[in-house]
Swiss-Prot record:
It comes from Streptococcus pneumoniae (strain ATCC 700669 / Spain 23F-1). It holds the Pfam family M20_dimer. Binds 2 Zn(2+) ions per subunit. NCBIfam families: peptidase-T, PRK05469.1, PRK13381.1. It catalyses: Release of the N-terminal residue from a tripeptide. Cleaves the N-terminal amino acid of tripeptides. GO terms for cellular component: cytosol. This is Peptidase T. The gene is pepT.
Length: 407
């Protein structure tokens, strides 16, 4: 189905800079997200028909569309995030490419281009309307496509009361891209049986498995002396960091793994001979493998300290989120419904693990099972990001189908 306000709504959203800031200590991490929620989303939530609309100190804009059929007793939530990733989000100037011809798309005058030779996903979209960047910023389809789709679904349901639906709760939240947006989510206030994050990629994505995730902060303490007299005196912290890294499995890196394979990822290293700080992330799907990865890092640190005869390697491990499969597989109702709706719409469900996390990873462990459905974005987090309007329309269809489902 086509929705006349969907494209303009999306274009309005992406032109607002809502980039999050991992170094901030506030919630939300940037004032622009507060302004976007209170000045743009809250008024529009009311206009499209949501009731009891409010903004919480945790950064979430919340609203409700009451059920219009007493036989549909479920309460279902839909959640998308306002923030965009760590890439330029100022001056977003989207291009609308109607009836895409399958060829190269020049991204404004930036010198960058979307070429099917480099981005095979483009081969799926001839004849469709694509929204791209102008090459100077990201687009923000992650996850403003999700926000636009949820808002459009509510607008359509309000205008078509003949479509019977259950109670719907909507939540637009902050700081998903920096991994803290759902930390303060109020599950008791949201009060639904289950929810969906509308934060996936291509048409048909339906995901209920995520990584389990941890962060590892390492400090290597060296001893700097003049290199000319360094023998048996100098301890080079840079070398300690290299030695530590070289004891991790060589092939367990993001660029060498896929599917259900986990990894260690060195994110940042700073320092000198005297001291070095290094940051890693640890990812795996199975709980035992996840715990084993953390234990392995601790074992390496302990072994190095024992060999050095002093405590020169300090490791701090912090769990970040867990595989939501552990919660959702106890009651697969949200997956069963979404899968059935997609199939009824002629959409082939693509059920595969997310090699990452969503707000649903944390919300599921707060008592609300929250799988993820497609929002349409491709090449997210950079200048090559784009989305198909037709895929966004199918996401709206899917949301409407889920809340009207009577099985």
């Amino acid at each position: 189905m086509t929705y006349p306000n969907l494209l303009d709504r999306f274009l309005t959203y992406v032109k607002v800079n809502t980039r999050s800031d991992e170094h901030s200590t506030t919630t939300p991490s940037t004032q622009s997200q507060v302004d976007f929620a209170t000045n743009v989303l809250i008024p529009e939530m009311k206009r499209v028909g949501l009731q009891n609309v409010y903004y919480l100190p945790n950064g979430f804009a919340i609203g409700t569309l009451p059920a219009n059929d007493p036989s549909l007793t479920r309460k279902i939530g839909f959640i998308s995030h306002m923030d965009t990733a760590d890439f330029n989000a100022e001056g977003v100037n989207p291009q609308v490419i109607e009836n895409y011809d399958g060829g190269v798309i020049e991204l404004g005058n930036s010198g960058f281009k979307l070429d099917p030779a480099d981005f095979k996903s483009l081969e799926k979209y001839p004849g469709q309307t694509l929204i791209t960047t102008d090459g100077t910023s990201l687009l923000g389809a992650d996850d403003k496509s999700g926000i636009a789709e949820i808002m459009t679904a509510i607008e359509y349901l309000t205008a078509h009361p003949e479509i019977k639906h259950c109670e719907i709760r909507v939540g637009f939240g902050p700081d998903e891209e920096i991994g803290v947006g759902a930390n303060k989510f109020d599950a008791e206030d949201f009060d639904v049986d289950f929810a969906y994050t509308v934060d996936g990629g291509p048409l048909g994505e339906l995901q209920y498995e995520t990584f389990s995730a941890a962060g590892a902060e390492l400090h290597f303490q060296g001893r700097n002396v003049h290199p000319g007299t360094a023998k048996e005196q100098m301890v080079n912290a840079l070398q300690l960091a290299i030695d530590f890294h070289n004891q991790l499995p060589e092939n367990d890196r993001p660029e060498l793994t896929e599917g259900y394979q986990g990894f260690y990822h060195l994110m940042d290293v700073t320092g000198s001979v005297e001291e070095v700080r290094a940051s890693y992330i640890i990812r795996d799907f199975e709980k035992d493998a996840f715990e084993a990865r953390k234990a392995s890092m601790q074992s390496i640190a302990d072994k190095m300290n024992a060999e050095l005869g002093s405590y020169r390697v300090t490791l701090n491990l912090t769990d970040q989120y867990y595989n939501m499969k552990e919660v959702i597989e106890k009651d697969m109702t949200p997956i069963t419904i979404a899968k059935a709706v997609m199939e009824d719409l002629g959409i082939t469900p693509i059920i595969e693990p997310i090699r990452g996390g969503t707000d649903g990873s944390k919300i599921s462990f707060m008592g609300i099972p929250t799988p993820n459905i497609f929002a349409g974005g491709e090449n997210m987090h950079g200048r090559f990001e784009y989305v198909s309007l037709q895929t966004m329309e199918r996401a709206v269809d899917t949301i409407i189908g889920i809340v009207a489902y009577k099985g």
